């Protein structure tokens, strides 16, 4: 079994009536025609060989590590009645969880006291929850790694390019959060976890990002390529958002159905209902099902403590179909039984053994209600057969950088010929070296010392 279990979503799951109201708030916040029935976050597509030429060489891209955690959006809004700030996490099943203890201020306009007087309202952030090892304390901690922003204080950003959204996320959301922790740590004692921003490097630095994966304080299973100048795709697949994984990390989420051996007790009368019974002492067969769309046979794992009845299997086959068999060793079966948890009908993440073609169990994915859709499975299989190796990407780095410089030069030429005269703008600081196993944390967003502030020369480091 794999030890990379996704963290549980913290907070209090909200009832249907509250969830409906929150969905409507997001609908208005993003200027959507109607509330989304599914998770409003964008979804990446698997990287293929054709994407090198058609995407990485054709337009500017950021690259960052792909965190193996739990994807979640964070919504921060003010309650118009109580005037209190509410913070909610939204998981991939579009469930909403209330988080108590946070306080997110706005960016001060005059002085730092505004950090205690203002509150974010109408902000929607995209990120990943992960359990990681704190480099300083060596303790395991929950952290939210942010990588995009859909709205900031009531202003929708989904039509803005990625570069602009990241700038708003850093300056208008993360910086005041950092400053509050730095200047008023006592006001942050109730925060349920810490927040960080992911490093976004230029695509031609992909080799350095890949080389840093083993140095990160959490598990990372690949790379994410995000186009610099594209808008945010709400609630669907984004063909420009690419996820690359090493061949061994290309996995599929299945619904696992157990076929328990049936034993006949011929000492009992033929009409005795106990004459046939399930033998739970013998290792069962494990069938992997892929989702074809539509509602599941059931929505709660605790309903799957017993084998499916004939009627339940008939209902299941309306939305799922058998795809493969899962090979479970006697040792794995012993570990599964020792969990003393329901197994039948759970979602499991599996990897394909390239030598034998067999599917191997990695971990349970209780954060997912359904397994991967048949279309997703097909894409993953294509990605496996058309596997893009890291060496293939590294070989293209000189061309990627050359194309980047060509586009940069054309923009400069165009602006000098047709653009209006603009005042000089300070050059953007280069991104942090990707070989450093850190995130945009704390000191990256600190202001220069104020002349009239004695303690500003020694601002607290708050890793």
From Swiss-Prot:
Class of the enzyme per the UniProt entry, highest EC level: transferase
Subcellular localization: Nucleus
CDD domains: Adenylation_mRNA_capping (cd07895)
One of the record's GO molecular function terms: RNA polymerase II C-terminal domain binding
Keyword annotations from UniProtKB, A to Z: GTP-binding, mRNA capping, mRNA processing, Nucleotide-binding, Nucleotidyltransferase, Nucleus, Transferase
Biased composition (Acidic residues): 441-455
A Gene Ontology BP annotation from the UniProt entry: 7-methylguanosine mRNA capping
Gene3D superfamilies in the cross-refs: DNA ligase/mRNA capping enzyme, Nucleic acid-binding proteins
Active-site residues, as the UniProt record annotates them: 66
Pfam families attached to this UniProt entry: mRNA_cap_C (PF03919), mRNA_cap_enzyme (PF01331)
Superkingdom per UniProt: Eukaryota
InterPro entries from the UniProt entry: mRNA_cap_enzyme_adenylation, mRNA_cap_enzyme_alpha, mRNA_cap_enzyme_C, mRNA_Capping_Enz/RNA_Phosphat, NA-bd_OB-fold
GO CC, alphabetical: mRNA capping enzyme complex
Reactions catalysed: a 5'-end diphospho-ribonucleoside in mRNA + GTP + H(+) = a 5'-end (5'-triphosphoguanosine)-ribonucleoside in mRNA + diphosphate
Family assignment from sequence similarity: Belongs to the eukaryotic GTase family.
Biological role stated in the UniProt entry: Second step of mRNA capping. Transfer of the GMP moiety of GTP to the 5'-end of RNA via an enzyme-GMP covalent reaction intermediate.
UniProt protein name: mRNA-capping enzyme subunit alpha
Source organism of this protein record: Eremothecium gossypii (strain ATCC 10895 / CBS 109.51 / FGSC 9923 / NRRL Y-1056)
Gene that produces this protein: CEG1
